[in-house]
Amino acid sequence: MEAKTAQAVAKYVRTSPRKVRQVIDLIRGKSVADAFAILKFTPVKSAADVAKVLKSAVANAEHNYEMNTADLYVQTCFVDQGPSMKRISPRAQGRADVIKKRMSHITVIVAEKPAKPAAAKKDPKAAAAKADANAGTKEG
């Protein structure tokens, strides 16, 4: 059975994708509660943007798919590059340099943790037979 997922996307965020990826890498695979705690104490501007997207993904999971928010974890999260605004910086002797102000598209996908399968119970007869077989091989 495939796990249900919910996603949220923030487009045209005015932060370089390279800087956002540093924050995204911290929360990938973590539970939602852990991810929020990590983002709260990450002293980077983009942490607030990522937290906003994560909060939206959790709200989507709860509202659209009726998932239990306590069981959610960050299944995947990634950052794509958006368009760049080009600005000019004047240089010496009439020249100009182009400054690219980059944008990011942040995507966060949350899913419910898969239920742990019931632990397979060992057959007591098989375990006893194996113990007897091992006991016969040891001679002092």
UniProtKB/Swiss-Prot annotation:
NCBIfam families: rplV_bact (TIGR01044). InterPro entries: Ribosomal_uL22, Ribosomal_uL22_bac/chlpt-type, Ribosomal_uL22_bac/org-type, Ribosomal_uL22_CS, Ribosomal_uL22_sf. This protein binds specifically to 23S rRNA; its binding is stimulated by other ribosomal proteins, e.g. L4, L17, and L20. It is important during the early stages of 50S assembly. It makes multiple contacts with different domains of the 23S rRNA in the assembled 50S subunit and ribosome. The globular domain of the protein is located near the polypeptide exit tunnel on the outside of the subunit, while an extended beta-hairpin is found that lines the wall of the exit tunnel in the center of the 70S ribosome. GO terms for cellular component: cytosolic large ribosomal subunit. CDD domains: Ribosomal_L22. Keywords: Ribonucleoprotein, Ribosomal protein, RNA-binding, rRNA-binding. Belongs to the universal ribosomal protein uL22 family. Residues 115-140 are annotated as: Disordered. GO terms for molecular function: rRNA binding; structural constituent of ribosome. GO terms for biological process: translation. This is Large ribosomal subunit protein uL22. The gene is rplV. Part of the 50S ribosomal subunit. It comes from the Bacteria.
